[in-house]
Design a protein with these regions (language model features):
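A glycine-rich helix N-cap at a beta->alpha junction
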Residues: 108-114, 183-204
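Short, Lys/Arg-enriched N-terminal segments with co-localized hydrophobic residues
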Residues: 19-38
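Cationic, amphipathic, low-complexity segments that mediate targeting or membrane/lipid association
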Residues: 7-8, 14-20
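Small-aliphatic-rich amphipathic alpha-helix that forms the alpha element of a beta-alpha
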Residues: 72-73, 118, 136-180
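Glycine/small-residue-rich phosphate/adenosyl-binding loop
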Residues: 64, 77-148
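C-terminal helix-cap and adjacent tail motif
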Residues: 43-51, 56-59, 131, 191-217
């Protein structure tokens, strides 16, 4: 705090007001991002969209991807096992190959042009399992997929905060992706997430009413 900014010979009330203004200014400075101020959480989750057209004018950086995955790591997981894994393709040649050979379903190859691609996996037989390999309950490896979903939600919300957009794709050729990126057999390939700067503004889809999904007892 820069107390030197406080003018001398002011009343106590005026001095307190100046200190408050300095504190608020420092706080606002601390929450600035490259795109402006941080969004409030409710605004953040409502602004997130699945984007199917990306601008070729903006390249996603390695540093931005690191921020996304760091946010993903803050998600809770079964006994803190953190079994999610991320394989990011930034190279234009590699991303074109991945899109053409592994994302040709539902025109995902076209929808993700000019976007970085993140393959998301989880190490199976850990989350939801005891050390001897016995499942803790009937869900089994569903817990690994569940935990990865929690991580990926953090990732796409962080992308929104940074002014980036995403598209989660489940239609992909997992075998070809595994071979192309040398993903171990001990990991289950779940989704591919496109990350980039939106070149469209999708409307917000209608959501279910609370009474359709929520019950109190």
């Amino acid at each position: 705090m820069n107390y030197a900014k406080i003018q001398p010979k002011h009343t106590l009330k005026e001095s307190i007001r100046q200190i408050f203004q300095i504190c608020v200014g420092n706080l606002l400075d601390s929450v600035k991002t490259e795109g402006g101020f941080l969004m409030e959480f409710q605004t953040l989750i409502e602004n997130r969209r699945s984007v199917r057209k990306y601008s070729f004018h903006t390249n996603v950086t390695k540093e931005q991807i690191q921020q996304l995955v760091q946010a993903a790591l803050e998600a809770p997981s079964w006994k803190n096992t953190e079994t999610g894994r991320y394989y990011c393709v930034l190279s234009e040649d590699m991303s074109q190959k991945l899109r053409k050979e592994c994302l040709c379903y539902a025109n995902n190859d076209i929808k993700t042009e000019h976007a970085a691609l993140i393959v998301t996996t989880f190490v199976h037989n850990r989350a939801g399992f005891q050390t001897d390999g016995t499942p803790d309950n009937e869900i089994g490896n569903g817990w690994g997929c569940y935990d990865l979903g929690l991580q990926n939600e953090n990732l796409i919300l962080k992308a929104t905060e940074l002014g980036l957009s995403t598209l989660i794709m489940g239609l992909r050729d997992g075998d070809k992706i595994r071979e192309m990126l040398s993903i171990p057999e001990s990991e289950t390939i779940v989704s591919v997430i496109a990350v980039g700067k939106a070149d469209e503004e999708p409307s917000r889809p209608r959501r279910r009413e609370l009474e359709d999904v929520l019950k109190f007892f």
